[in-house]
Amino acid sequence: MYRGKKGHTTTARHIAVLELVRPLIPSDAEVILLGDGEYDSVGMLQWIEAHARWHLVVRTAQNSLVQYGGHLFPLSDLPVEPGISLTLENIGFTAQDCGPLLALACWELDCEDPIYLISNLDDAKMALKYYKRRYRLETLFSDKKSRGFPIHKSHLSLPNRLSRLLLAASLAFIWMIYLGLSAIVTGQRTLIDPTHRQDKSLFRLGLDWLTHLPKWGQPIPLSFFLSPDLLFHKSVR
């Protein structure tokens, strides 16, 4: 945590965080860094190439410049249409010609606008497949804020106190996932979600389960470890 204004932070701060994370990752692990437009800087790309040697797929702006075929132009010049994805290989990113990289313009039918990605992967389909996993993180943010734990309303302003709150909320998040899985595996999901389909997330099921257990006089299980019995149970989708 650090004290700053709302919005994007600097490349230097992102790299400082990644420097802390990098020693925790096994040296033989394959790492795919997924990020939004804050991670598309030349400085970030150069750091990954020089220090981490990870794969990455990050979003970039439509006015980002790429060099391709001897021309420098913004990605918005690509003739992409709804339902169509375009890929440029061996591009140089920005006027600094950082690369070679992939540039992707993807416009899915259910989206109002295309998104633009850059990646150091060789396979455009795999790059897009990996990037789609990033959307799962958005549910984590909403679960910790507006849809679950309203930590954004804590009114805490000191970075060290916010760090402790975030740590506690993260442990509680894992606990809610455990409770949600437990409700499904034990066949009691219908007590808190009486529908024929599962509309609620595992987190939401766990939070509702925590609310109802004391009402029924049942003990509240506390665990942060998801056993194989829970993870691979036939009832869990």
What label would you give each PLM region?
Residues 1-237:
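Single, function-defining residue in the core of a domain
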